């Protein structure tokens, strides 16, 4: 009988962070197996140690290919990509070896997705420190995956049931935001948001709101001119392309309306403008998904949590949500391909 559940590659993340234990907790939830076939890309010994930590009733089944998985609750299918000495790993203390391993998990997942052998990847957290120890030139998942897939433009969306936010600028100092904003970048982010909501979220006519930058949306230029000179023209240009978009709106009122389903996504000018309201609502179950990639990639919206790693107390809610979203997007994009 044909199994239509998408195969979701779950990258283990930093071995000395909370990734391994939240994977065990997530795969201990029978519901995960109703929406997908989860395949761990990581280290067999580390995952066995995490299973022991959580006292989970779970067997480990290794396979060299996604086709060899069993995909049934109570069995963790894993493609073993490293052979770390699990007994000697110190929680919160990355090494060049753990850094290289976590990069291998990511690149293997990307390659499998690009080859169509899995339908999506859901990534567990990593750190810039571990990547640097491994000699990587990249600072995080997004840059690494964009480079691996030869993708020139990507954007970060934080998504939950009540709110979705997409960022124009991401990890830059607040004092540099205004200088970095331009009409082309804002237009590209709006366009990418619209296309993703259609193709990966199944929203045929997405409603997009755009946040202003300054207090009260600049108050007709009294508190800043970015709304008049940069943001509003980008919104008008997006509208002329047939995108249902409005704004710029003062952020202090915008997010109330967005969280009450008046918009399908909000395009934000900088990191904290979007993430503060998002995490107020979706602190435990938010998902980070990368827009613009030729593959589906979702991720937890938290870090490695070195301070609580390997204590068995980490909350798996965000990973479960990321797996569910990856499965949903895989199902929607698969249907889109069939209908074309």
Curated annotation (Swiss-Prot):
A Pfam family per the record: PdxA
Enzyme class: oxidoreductase
Biological pathway: Cofactor biosynthesis; pyridoxine 5'-phosphate biosynthesis; pyridoxine 5'-phosphate from D-erythrose 4-phosphate: step 4/5
Residues the entry annotates as binding substrate: 141-142, 279, 288, 297
Keyword Manganese: no
GO biological process annotation, one example: pyridoxine biosynthetic process
Tagged with keyword Magnesium: yes
Name of the featured protein: 4-hydroxythreonine-4-phosphate dehydrogenase
Originating organism: Desulforapulum autotrophicum (strain ATCC 43914 / DSM 3382 / VKM B-1955 / HRM2) (Desulfobacterium autotrophicum)
